């Protein structure tokens, strides 16, 4: 998923040797928990920033919800057709997909703000900063230490 790709980016961008090992050997795997633990230990102010944004809670909830659907733990949530002849778009399913995608995008946005965003913040244009901070309350922006200028 885009969220997993984003998680891996935040880790492997500074771990090229581990990435090379992963390419050579499928036995080497870094999971979501290991990446979050890495950020807690090594990304400056990650704990404070993720708490301000509710990142880990939202990430775990999104991951659990999507996993439940993917692994069939919510039967009927995505499939309402009884035969191929009746396959057609279903409004309720589309809403679930769109809402899940939007939440995943928001979680990824917050992940980037807590990790690589802070590192590269001074290189972003004023317009980019405005877009990245859109919708965040002033007190949260202050806690994150991310200016709009």
Locations of the language-model features?
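A cross-kingdom marker of C-terminal helix-rich interaction/assembly modules
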Residues: 4-149
